[in-house]
UniProtKB/Swiss-Prot annotation:
The active site is at D134. It catalyses: beta-D-fructose 6-phosphate + ATP = beta-D-fructose 1,6-bisphosphate + ADP + H(+). GO terms for biological process: canonical glycolysis; fructose 1,6-bisphosphate metabolic process; fructose 6-phosphate metabolic process. Its EC number is 2.7.1.11. Catalyzes the phosphorylation of D-fructose 6-phosphate to fructose 1,6-bisphosphate by ATP, the first committing step of glycolysis. This is ATP-dependent 6-phosphofructokinase. Pathway: Carbohydrate degradation; glycolysis; D-glyceraldehyde 3-phosphate and glycerone phosphate from D-glucose: step 3/4.
Length: 369
């Protein structure tokens, strides 16, 4: 895209999270103030393209846009359901009928996979910014929304711990993460969990019960905190006998059945509170840097890339590479897994590996957090 007046589209797709409005703010500010472009906000992502629903976004109309800095959710709305590819021709036509010169999507890995196909088929000038509280988008260390979600869960764990200790109860706290356990792992360590269960490392009810017994024998503690990602699985879970309740309730029921000692259990499913609220400082910084960079890429005529955060700075990576490697799982051999084990946290039936200095490690994937 040249520096002459162009029309840039932006939308948010997938589940909402803190920092979306902050990213929109950065895109609008840089595109309008630095390049003099027109920015259209597409309402409800691809549904807005189908229905040709868009609103003009500019600093004047948004009151200087300062209000967006700390506003949760998304002013553009979002969707995370529907048969988008089944309406591919309508979606693609919407891009052109709205007169877009380029489109920036703030999205997670599922939406990115679909949008990449649409962009290729429709020959769009397309760019992406990663957002997800699961932090499972590949080739980026952080996605917008993750840091705030971790802090939200940690605050909840702090509150639950005090009531658990007061009544000598074991709390099973279920957090989001169907395929990746980043949120459970980060918040569990920071929030003082005794047990962290994630999809990447199978657990056993026997291992959980033994750890709870160890807490009583070693410290005399009657209470405990179990953080479980919603996609966690047992060592030999029978796929032919699916659960008919939440993973948190399932684990609590199994502990009650198999524990050799009497345990008073409670289950807390944090649910959508993890998606809400004002973004924390890190998410605001990510959103600002990623939004600015996406606009600069459009100005340079560089498309088909996702803005990412690697080693403390904003970089760009091919969307095709991101899609091929999604979702980004927790590495069972990572530093944080070893840290949790070193703190005495049960993270599944996995032995603790010896420490390896990451600066001496040749395989960055294994050594990375």
């Amino acid at each position: 895209m040249s520096s002459s007046r162009k029309r840039l589209g932006v939308f948010t797709s997938g589940g909402d999270c803190p920092g979306l409005n902050t990213a929109i703010r950065a895109i609008v500010a840089h595109a309008t103030l630095s390049y003099g472009w027109e920015v259209l906000g597409i309402l409800h992502a691809t549904q807005g393209l189908i229905e040709r629903k868009a609103i003009p976004l500019n600093a004047e109309g948004l009151g200087g846009m300062d209000v967006l800095l700390n506003m949760g959710g998304t002013i553009l709305g979002a969707i995370n359901k529907g048969d988008t590819l089944g309406h591919a021709d309508e979606v693609i036509a919407g891009y052109y009928e709205l007169g877009l010169d380029a489109l920036i999507a703030i999205c997670g890995d599922g939406s990115l996979r679909i949008l990449h196909q649409l962009a290729q088929k429709g020959n769009w000038n397309f760019l992406a910014i990663p957002k997800t509280i699961d932090n499972d988008v590949a080739l980026t260390d952080r996605a917008i929304g993750f840091d705030t979600a971790v802090n939200t869960v940690v605050e909840a764990l702090n509150r639950i711990t005090s009531t658990a200790a007061s009544h000598d109860r074991v709390f099973v706290v279920e957090v989001m993460g169907r395929t990746a356990g980043h949120l459970a792992l980060y918040s569990g360590i920071a929030g003082g969990a005794d047990i962290i269960l994630i999809p990447e490392i199978p657990y056993s009810i026997e291992g959980i019960c033994q750890h709870l017994q160890k807490l009583r024998d070693r410290w005399g503690r009657q209470f405990a905190l179990i953080v479980v990602a919603e996609g966690s699985k047992q060592l030999e879970e029978d796929a032919n006998h699916p659960r008919h309740c939440s993973i948190g309730q399932y684990i609590a029921d199994k502990i009650a059945q198999h524990s050799p000692i009497p345990i008073e259990l409670r289950v807390s499913v944090l649910g959508h509170i993890q998606r809400g609220g004002a973004p924390m400082a890190m998410d605001r910084l990510l959103a600002a840097g990623m939004g600015n960079t996406a606009v600069d890429l459009a100005a340079q005529g560089t498309f088909g890339r996702m803005v990412a955060w690697q080693a403390g700075q904003v970089v760009t990576v091919p969307i095709a590479d991101v899609v091929a490697k999604c979702p980004r799982h927790v590495d069972p051999n990572s530093f944080l897994i070893r840290t949790a084990q070193g703190l005495g946290i049960y993270v599944g039936d996995k032995p603790m590996l010896p420490y390896v200095d990451p600066t001496l490690c040749r395989d960055q994937v294994i050594c990375a957090i």
